[in-house]
Amino acid sequence: MKGKTKKNKGKKIAEEAQSKIDSPTKMGAKGPFEFDNCGLSYYCCSTAGITIPESLKAQSEGGKLIEKAEAGDLLFFDTIGKGEINYVGVCIGNGKMVHAPGSGKMVKEAEYVNNTYWTPKYKFAKRYWN
């Protein structure tokens, strides 16, 4: 039963992320109505009762490194090719994530597996819910 409860936390994080699709994005916003990329991951984890760091750097350094991401895991990317993590999305399973692109856009769902943009930029996944 305990394992099921932990898995439910990952599912809850993913469901919360999906519920925020089409919410506006704004640099520095951590919800509940506007988000930046690390604000979205922070908010979704907090609604599942999980405390994670607020900053992207700290989020990428914490948690447990996961080889195969599941719903609720955080996905980290180097989108500018400088060898540094500069972006995070929330895995919702099946090779998909929810993320908050730059200010003035909307939170959206995207494939990060077999995707010409996201796949080469993907670096690792972290789990905070287990």
PLM segments and residue spans:
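Aromatic- and glycine-rich peptidoglycan recognition patches
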Residues: 1-4, 8, 50, 57-58, ...
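Catalytic cysteine-centered active-site loop
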Residues: 19-71, 79
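Short, surface-exposed beta-edge/turn micro-motifs
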Residues: 71-72, 86-88
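Short, positionally conserved secondary-structure boundary motifs
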Residues: 8-13, 41
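Conserved acidic residues
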Residues: 70-73, 123
